[in-house]
């Protein structure tokens, strides 16, 4: 099974205040922030602060000892954030074009996971609302998610689809996570020594 979680960054510039934003969206963002599901922007004018997003992300990776195998993103308004990741991390970054030809397969994969019950999630109001607000639309190329109404928020669903752009191949033999070289590069020193002694490494055949 797959498991998904989200963390949203909440701007309030257009609404005028976070209180107005909560009333407009019908979501108690202060309560959800206390539960760890979102961060209300600290920007004095209510704009998203890329530095705040960047620091949160790196802290999350470090605090949870994550080995990032793929970072897919919508290139729109992400240049500063991605440049910081490129300069300071070795994460594999990939811009994903937000068009049907690119998104139809991960969209179908995610839809199938939910239908078959092969995905779990935390009881998180932001993700729940995004999933409810998202609808599948089809054209002559394939399927893609869209908003039920223009004012609805589905950013979390868009992010999940971007993540599954590569993740849907994770258990295939050709996936990067199944590449022996990649495995060694992402092992601890102890794990590397164990791997070198393992017949499956193929290195023992040379001696």
Per-range role (PLM):
Residues 1-98, 108, 125-207:
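RNase H-like, metal-dependent nuclease domains and their acidic two-metal-ion catalytic environment used
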Residues 95-122:
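Short alpha-helix plus adjacent loop in nuclease-associated cores
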